[in-house]
């Protein structure tokens, strides 16, 4: 009886450790984690720490990040940014590290960072299997909403896409067999408004000179 109690406690502790095991990812200071599992990433470690840590649950995880190494040029400190990387991996109870290349200088980075040769390695230095892709957004890059972008990416089913439980799903809508009178009136009002808008277009078109009519036709043809 005295032996059973300690064994039971030890078993309970072991089971508890298994149930709450997680994945820790060490992140270098020049890597910015922009989203994790469809949400804004929460990293531990101080602002000036050489490495920070991202804690994730066991199983399939998705991390969105960018690598931006800094270089000294005279009195200036300049960075070169990689594209935004989407990485999906499946691990459990592991300590991982994002390994990124070290470039000799700014020119070396500018020539090679677009084809970023990075790895996710475990505690023994062995590379973990990763599905990866790039999260590309044309045009202005300032103020990007990465959580929204990765939501759209996952919905589109990209190479490193993940379906999260919190993702919004379309619910079926049952339409009434008989359209209520107020809906009929609203529809009639909308049709009337469309008709009025069309009449006004005709009116102003007839009033316009030849040059304005030509510009209007060109605009319509482009739509």
Curated annotation (Swiss-Prot):
<feature type="signal peptide">
    <location>
        <begin position="1"/>
        <end position="21"/>
    </location>
</feature>
<comment type="similarity">
    <text>Belongs to the UPF0319 family.</text>
</comment>
<dbReference type="Pfam" id="PF09829">
    <property type="entry name" value="DUF2057"/>
</dbReference>
<protein>
    <recommendedName>
        <fullName>UPF0319 protein VPA1584</fullName>
    </recommendedName>
</protein>
<dbReference type="InterPro" id="IPR018635">
    <property type="entry name" value="UPF0319"/>
</dbReference>
<keyword id="KW-0732">Signal</keyword>
């Amino acid at each position: 009886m005295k032996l059973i109690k300690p064994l039971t406690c030890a078993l309970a502790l072991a089971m508890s450790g298994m149930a709450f095991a997680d994945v820790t990812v060490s992140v270098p200071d020049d890597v910015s984690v922009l989203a994790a599992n469809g949400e804004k990433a929460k990293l531990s470690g101080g602002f000036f720490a050489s490495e920070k840590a991202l804690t994730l649950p066991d199983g399939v995880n998705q991390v969105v990040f960018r690598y931006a190494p800094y270089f000294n040029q005279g009195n200036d400190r300049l960075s070169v940014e990689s594209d935004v990387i989407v990485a999906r991996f499946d691990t459990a109870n592991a300590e991982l590290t994002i390994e990124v290349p070290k470039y000799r200088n700014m020119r070396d980075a500018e020539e090679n960072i677009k084809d970023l040769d990075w790895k996710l390695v475990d505690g023994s230095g062995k590379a973990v299997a990763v599905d990866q892709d790039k999260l590309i957004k044309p045009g202005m890059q300032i103020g990007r909403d990465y959580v929204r972008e990765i939501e759209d990416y996952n919905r589109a089913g990209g190479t490193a896409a993940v379906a999260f439980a919190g993702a919004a799903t379309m619910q079926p809508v049952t339409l009434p067999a008989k359209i209520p009178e107020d809906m009929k009136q609203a529809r009639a009002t909308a049709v009337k408004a469309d008709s009025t808008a069309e009449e006004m277009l005709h009116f102003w078109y007839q009033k316009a000179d030849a040059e304005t009519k030509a510009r209007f036709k060109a605009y319509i043809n482009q739509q």
